[in-house]
């Protein structure tokens, strides 16, 4: 697997050896590799030319913010590299990474793609931000940026016995998963920072007992102590947002 091999010139050497490790035959082939995959090494980043690109106008403070804000849509290897782009790294390296990040997503117009994403970051900051956290750093902000706008959002703020919560439902995710839900709740009941408690999306937090946690203030001892139990009886008989979608 040469996915992570930096671009450059190489000699591919094939050798045939006997049981005594004596060379019987050898063939050498020159290859030139242009790595158009993920930029995941310092060597690859250094090769990027950002002269005359949209990154020219950004200060180091802006670059630090922008790199942090793209984490929700970055691959794991990209996120690891972003973490390593600390304050000690020269700003030009951060520019190279940011520019290539969007070139990989839209080679024809990376600036347009970047501006579209930046608008979404502004949206989640406005909708989900708190006095202490930018919206893109919250669970709802991250999910919105990663998967897009939900097909439906069911919000419950004053449901008896339950913490404030929201159900986000997606008919289809970008990777073609279907009928996906996300459950967020706000256990402190004093902020706008809703925490992800359950989802059926691959790679996301999955808790079969999320409803028990949501209604723990009114759940019976048997419902709480039975660790195979995933439901809490509706003792009031009113509307419950959790009943809108099963996931």
Regions found by a protein language model. Give the residues of each.
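Residues within mature, well-folded domains
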Residues: 3-7, 26-38, 45-247
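Short, exposed coil/turn segments at beta-strand boundaries within extracellular/luminal domains
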Residues: 20-25
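Residue-level signal for short segments within beta-strands and strand-turn junctions
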Residues: 16-18, 186
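A short tyrosine-centered beta-strand micro-motif
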Residues: 1, 8-16
